[in-house]
Each structure stands twice: as C-alpha cells, then as structure tokens.
Amino acid sequence: MLLLLLVPLFLRPLGAGGAQTPNVTSEGCQIIHPPWEGGIRYRGLTRDQVKAINFLPVDYEIEYVCRGEREVVGPKVRKCLANGSWTDMDTPSRCVRICSKSYLTLENGKVFLTGGDLPALDGARVDFRCDPDFHLVGSSRSICSQGQWSTPKPHCQVNRTPHSERRAVYIGALFPMSGGWPGGQACQPAVEMALEDVNSRRDILPDYELKLIHHDSKCDPGQATKYLYELLYNDPIKIILMPGCSSVSTLVAEAARMWNLIVLSYGSSSPALSNRQRFPTFFRTHPSATLHNPTRVKLFEKWGWKKIATIQQTTEVFTSTLDDLEERVKEAGIEITFRQSFFSDPAVPVKNLKRQDARIIVGLFYETEARKVFCEVYKERLFGKKYVWFLIGWYADNWFKTYDPSINCTVEEMTEAVEGHITTEIVMLNPANTRSISNMTSQEFVEKLTKRLKRHPEETGGFQEAPLAYDAIWALALALNKTSGGGGRSGVRLEDFNYNNQTITDQIYRAMNSSSFEGVSGHVVFDASGSRMAWTLIEQLQGGSYKKIGYYDSTKDDLSWSKTDKWIGGSPPADQTLVIKTFRFLSQKLFISVSVLSSLGIVLAVVCLSFNIYNSHVRYIQNSQPNLNNLTAVGCSLALAAVFPLGLDGYHIGRSQFPFVCQARLWLLGLGFSLGYGSMFTKIWWVHTVFTKKEEKKEWRKTLEPWKLYATVGLLVGMDILTLAIWQIVDPLHRTIETFAKEEPKEDIDVSILPQLEHCSSKKMNTWLGIFYGYKGLLLLLGIFLAYETKSVSTEKINDHRAVGMAIYNVAVLCLITAPVTMILSSQQDAAFAFASLAIVFSSYITLVVLFVPKMRRLITRGEWQSEAQDTMKTGSSTNNNEEEKSRLLEKENRELEKIIAEKEERVSELRHQLQSRQQIRSRRHPPTPPDPSGGLPRGPSEPPDRLSCDGSRVHLLYK
C-alpha cells in the first residue's frame, strides 16, 4: 500500500551509497595530454593515483612543465571549470627552446629581430646597430639555435678622441678591514680591479677617470663617523660614498642627504635600509634580506600553493622580512592562513601550527632557535611527505647535527625532522658561464681576484661579497656615464659637482635607479628602495646534505630549475588537505532487488485487476463493490511504480533531469495513496455509517448508492491533485545538496573525501510537509478507528469490509513506523530507501493479497461462477449466496442435533425398561398392599408413565 506520509522523506535521500561511485566525482574535467617534450604536474596526487582516475574535480589546477632547456609558451596553468572544460583550451601550450632575451637589447644601439614566431625561439635572428658616435665591438648578427646564440653579444663603444685629457672623479669608501665583518679584505681588491677595468674602457666615461679614497671603518659606527667627517671636509670632493657594514651604512646613508651625496653599499643586508624616507639616496649591490621573499613566492606559485603559514623569532630583521612577505603573497593571490611568533620557546607556536593543519611553513629564526623549533617539530610530527619547511640558507651545512644542550632531541631525530626542507640564499657569483659587461665570466673574475689576495680565499674576509663590490663600481660608472652624456650626448659636467649641487645628485640618482647590466654577480638592477635584485640559490636537504635544485632571477622572473628536487611522497604536497567532493549513490544491488519486487507487485496488481473485471458479473464479486477494488489495485500499481523514481539519483540521471524525477515521485505517491487507500477508506466509512446507527434509522440507510462511494473517492483524489498542483506551481521541488563531514580515506594519501547527498526539496518544504502529514495522518487514524468499530458488522452489500479493515491496519502500522524511522535515516540513503520502498512494497502486497486472493480462492474451490440471473433460474429463489450458506450450515447442524436426540431417546428407553424391572421385583418381595390413599375407593387401571414426564431424579440419572 502507498505511504504518502513518507513522500517528503523519499524526496530527500536520493543520492546514495558510498559503494557505488562510478567516478571520483560526478562533476569535473577529463585528464588531458601534456605538450610534446613536456609533462603535467598534478598537485597533491601521485603518479599511481593519476593513472587510476579519469576525471579531476572542479577548480583543480594542473601545471605544464618542460624537459631540458625548454620553456612553456602559452598557458602554463590550466584550471578545471564547472562546465567540465579546462581554461584557455583555445590557446595551445608548447615546450620550445628559448635563447637569452638579453640579446634583444643593446645599450647605445638598436636590435632588429627577424625570423621565429616569437622572440628568442629557435631560428630567430638579431642584427645589431650602434647609435651615432659609437661603433660596434663584436659580431653584428647572431642566430638562436637550440637555446644558444651563435655569437657572443656585442657592445657599442664610443668613438674617443685620441689624446683627450681625462678629469678625475673621486669615490670615498669605507672598507671594514677588521671587526665583526672584515669584508674589506677581499672587497677592496675587487673595487680596485673594477676601477682598472672601467678606466681602461673607451666607451665608459671617456673624459673621466675614477679614483678611490678609502679608510678602514672596522665595521664600527663610531670609527666610521670619524672617517666620514674626514671624507666630507677634506679635499677633493667625493661624488659618492661606499660603506660596507649595515651598521656603518645606516649612519652614512642617514647623513649623506645633508651633503647631496649618493651612497652605494656593497655589503649591507639590513631590511631597515630599504626605507626610502629615512635613506633617500641609498643604493646597495648586496641584496636585502627580504630578497628571499620573491623566490619563496615564485616557488609557491610553481608548486601551486595558495595557503601558507609562518613562524618567526621576534626580532626586527625577521619581523620586517615577514611583513614584506605578507605583502608579496597578497599580491600573488596567496594567503598566509596562520602566523606564529616566539621569543625563546617555540613549543606552543609549533603545536598551534599542527592544530591548524599548516602544510607549507616559512620559518624565520637564527640557527640556535632553528634547532629548538625542529626539536618541537619532531615531537609534534610536523614533518614528512605532507609538510614543507622554508628556512634561511645561511645556516651552517650541519646546523641540525650540532650539539645543543638546550634541546632534548637526538641527532637522528633532528635529521629526520629536517629532511626535505627548502632553503633560499642570495647568489653572489653568477652561476652561468656567461660574460659580464666587463667581458669576464664569473670564474675568470674569481681567478683574477684570487691572484690579488695575499691569503687563501677561505681565510679572507668578504670573499663571497667581493663580486658585489666589483659590480658596485660598474653600477657607479654606468650611472655617471649616463649623467655625463656618455661622451657624445648632452649631459652635465661631473667636475661641476659640489655638496650643494642637488641637480647633479638628482641626475646621478635617476641614472643609478635605472641601472641594468650583467655583472659577475649576476644581473644588476635596483628596486624602488635601492636594494639589489639578485639571483637566489634554492637548495633542498636530501639525505642529510644540501643539494642545489635551482636559481631564481627576480628581475627577469626567471626560474632556472635543475629538476633534482626530491619529495618523500613522490611529488610536492598540497598546501592543504585536498578535498574531493563525491556523491553518495544508492546501492545498485538494493535498487535492483527492490525494483524486481516492485515489478512483481505491479504484475500481481494487474492480475487482480483483470480477475476483478472478468468476474464482475458474479454475485459474490458484485457484493464487494468491484469498482472500488479496481481503484485500489490501480492505486497499488501507482505506488509500486513510484519505487523506480525513488531510486534514481545522480548515478543514473543528470542535474537537469532531477526536478522531473522529483515531481514524478510526488505525483505517483500522491495519486496512488488517494486511489488505493481512499477506496478502502470509503468502504469502511459507509459500513460504519449504515450499521452503527440507531435501530430506527437503519432501514432507510441500508440502501447503498454506488455513486456516493465513487464521489467520496473522487473528492479525496481531487484534494490531492489540487494540493500537488499548487505545490508544483508555487514552490516546485528542485535538487539540493546535503554535505557531510570530511572523511579520510584508508590509503595514506593527503586527500579528504567530502561526501554529498542529493535531495528533492523546496523553499517551504516544512509547510508542505505539515499539510501532508496532518491530512494523511488523520485519514490513517480515522481508518483504524472505523475498521475497529465495524469488525463485527455483517452486511451483504460490502461482503469484504473485514478484509478492508485488515488492509487498513497494515497500511497504518507500516506508515506510523516507517515515517519517523525514515526521517531519522534521511542522511543514510540505503537505509532510508530500503525502509521507504519496502514499506510501499509490503503494504501493496498485503492489500492485494487480503482483498483479492480470498475471492479467487472462493470462486475456484466452490465453483461459484454463476451470475445473479443464472442463480435465480436454478433455485427459483432470490436468496443470495450469503443466505444459502447459512441455510446449509443450519441444515447440517439440525441433522447433527437429530442424531444426538435419537441417541438420547434410545438411552432413555433403556433406562425406563430397567426401572420397570426393578419395580416388579420389589413388588414380589412386599405382597401386602399399602393403605389406599383414596380411602378404599377402587383405582382405575394403571397408566404407563409418560415418556416425557420425568422427575428431577430421573433427569439426573438420564444425563449422568
């Protein structure tokens, strides 16, 4: 029987069972092929996992990577859209060889590009031409082939007038030859080398000669103050100042603006020196400590990380560095989800990182604090294939193996905790074997400088920073060359500079700010704060030792990758647990099983309906109101048919088809309930109305008018149609998604499953549920009451009302039990579907069996196939089948009673005979005649006793 009370419940749990999942998700994009000579990096997935799936979820990003010296031309990253396609599919991505783009520009000249569909591709050709008053030194043409230019890059040299007189320009320098950082030991010889190379060039400052005046600052601000005074107040005038240490540079740069002097440092790294308001004329070829941040951001983008966390030691240098990182990641669309700091004890911050599920962590602290941090990292298990740590690269190579009494972790534990972390370190020597503006490679520079040093390079202070000092002189020379006009163009006279001439200072500042050239330390360029933009070395700890995995040039946004990075999990981890949305679908075995039962039930309903129609002329069938029974069979068929759309979900149908399925469930169940239960309710209502009234009102009510029964059923069906139509028009059912808590898969992968379940719902679902629950619930309760009240009533007009009552009991019980259970289990698709569908199946089966099977059995076993006319002709009587049955029962009972009476009479006769015999014997023993009670009057002849006149003793003897 139908269970419309369960309609809203069936309209909800129609995504279903976890066991049936045809794809990772019902929505997503199909995996695509990489370009030739390239591959695809899948974030958070291993190679085996990629092979096992065909679709990737919406918003998932893939990145193209190329082999060898090739680079991606076209979109590097594609994102899965909601419509199932990847972004920018109309633009192909290719892996091509690209030559250096530095050949596309020529100072004091022009470059003409021909061939190749894009600059610097294989087959591209460049021709070089110099401006007037300059001549070309080198080849005038170069061709790009297999990522290399065919000839070295030429340069334009000024046409110098022979025997021209050159004027001296002085530089005031402070070299720390001793103290905390004795960098002047190697930087001073490097500066002297640069001055020799610059002064020997005919195309740079052809009318001037750079000369150096220097002092030993000892990396002491007090000592530096003394020498600064001497430089400023003693002739000759210095056009620029060159301090070394950060502490000395802070003093010099803050005071230099009062004398309109440009300050160029070669060894200062403090982020505080990037403050343009405080140090308006400061430049440095030594990168700021914040230069690590562009590299970090680039790596975040390379590996597709959008969420990072940070932990820092509370010192000024790390705070300012982290503030800069926060601004940069925000511009790149990356979020710092969690920021922690500590002064001396990192235990609590590390625990907080673990609690917040931090995966990509940037650590800023000194070496001693680094050991404390990673001891806590080991305790919290905040390492392994799910985590990546970014640290500063200037720690000692074995910093994690150094004995430290402040921690309680062993060397083995520390080694395990730090494995795989990434470090960034400033590159102070160009790793590429290319020639700089001085026509020297970095290796040639090292060899030439080593010959000038008095001690071994490892024992010489500032040897690593020496390339920066060398390039500082070249940056100054090129800026002064631009300011003076380069010998052939209009410019200022450098010899006119004095400490009150701000005009020349401003021009030198602008020229210095626009510097861009290839030095022995790499590409030299300054950012808006005057800090050097240099290459960054990227290393990874692999097997307990650091391995170079790449370089990054932030000025060109060029990442040189060696592809030697290794990951514990085989690939870079995700920045968070990868959440894959999956729909819970109904178990197909359950759906098929219930569908088979429902199909058999529909067949049974058709058989019952056919039987009822075929035998509608039989009196016994006629007296059961066959038309109402036919409606019941049709209602059961509709209810059983509703099982099929109840089991349809996203596994079988698309999103656009879901509203139609929702409406099908609603209408099939609604009409099925009205027809099936309404027909039975109408029968039991009429029986109760007619046969439970007072005796004086019965006679005129016993006339059954069928049209009233049909009108009652029509009223119930009409109410349902009206209500369902209003519901569908005003607030139609649509597809909604229920989201459950994340689930961790059994496999040890960094993925969480987000289960979702499809439901049919509407905006005012609770209102409609209240209407249906109230209306149908009252019908069920009233049906139970009427069935109970009429259980002892017997009527020939509706001879199956007791069977109808039994069917109503079953339907009501199943509804009242299944409705609340299904509401509780609405989020468990298999259980909810099983309860709801089986309730429909069982109630329909019971109704059909109770109403129709007894009729079939009676007609088959008793052969009562005659119609009413045939029965009248045969018997000559209008006695109905019910009266004939009663007559036969009474006759049988009468025969049994007659048999019993005959047996009793025979027994009575036998007892009488025995009684007479005893009386005769007694009379012989007592011959005297007793006194005559009649007073001597003669007695008439004795009469035999009446067989029916017995006293109490005889009756007792008779039945003893």
Swiss-Prot record:
- Give a GO cellular-component term: synaptic vesicle
Q: In which tissues is it expressed?
A: Expressed in neuronal tissue including cortex, cerebellum and spinal cord. Not detected in non-neuronal tissues including heart, liver, spleen and kidney.
What does the subunit comment say?
Heterodimer of GABBR1 and GABBR2. Homodimers may form, but are inactive. Interacts (via C-terminus) with ATF4 (via leucine zipper domain). Interacts with JAKMIP1. Interacts with KCTD8, KCTD12, KCTD12B and KCTD16; this interaction determines the pharmacology and kinetics of the receptor response, the KCTD proteins markedly accelerating the GABA-B response, although to different extents.
State what protein this is by name: Gamma-aminobutyric acid type B receptor subunit 1
Phosphothreonine-modified residues are where?
Answer: T872, T929
Q: Which Gene3D superfamilies match?
A: 3.40.50.2300, Complement Module, domain 1
Its taxonomic placement starts with: Eukaryota, Metazoa, Chordata, Craniata, Vertebrata
Q: Which parts form a coiled-coil structure per UniProt? A: 868-924
Give the gene that encodes this protein: Gabbr1
Q: Name one GO molecular function term.
A: G protein-coupled GABA receptor activity
- Pfam families named among the record's database cross-references: 7tm_3, ANF_receptor, Sushi
User: Polar residues composition bias: which ranges?
Assistant: 867-879
Q: Which cysteines are joined by disulfide bonds?
A: C99-C144, C130-C156, C219-C245, C375-C409
Where, subcellularly, is it found? Cell membrane; Postsynaptic cell membrane; Cell projection, Dendrite
- Stretches for region Interaction with ATF4: 887-915
Q: Which residues form the signal peptide?
A: 1-19
Annotated GO biological process: adenylate cyclase-inhibiting G protein-coupled receptor signaling pathway; gamma-aminobutyric acid signaling pathway; negative regulation of cell population proliferation; negative regulation of dopamine secretion; negative regulation of epinephrine secretion; negative regulation of gamma-aminobutyric acid secretion; negative regulation of synaptic transmission; neuron-glial cell signaling
Q: How does it sit in the membrane?
A: Multi-pass membrane protein
The Sushi domain, residue ranges = 29-95, 97-158
* Classification via PROSITE patterns: G_PROTEIN_RECEP_F3_4, SUSHI
Region described as Disordered: 866-891, 908-960
Sequence similarity:
Belongs to the G-protein coupled receptor 3 family. GABA-B receptor subfamily.
- Please list the residue ranges that the record places on the Extracellular side of the membrane: 20-590, 652-666, 731-767, 825-832
Cytoplasmic-side stretches of the chain, per the record, are: 612-630, 688-709, 789-803, 854-960
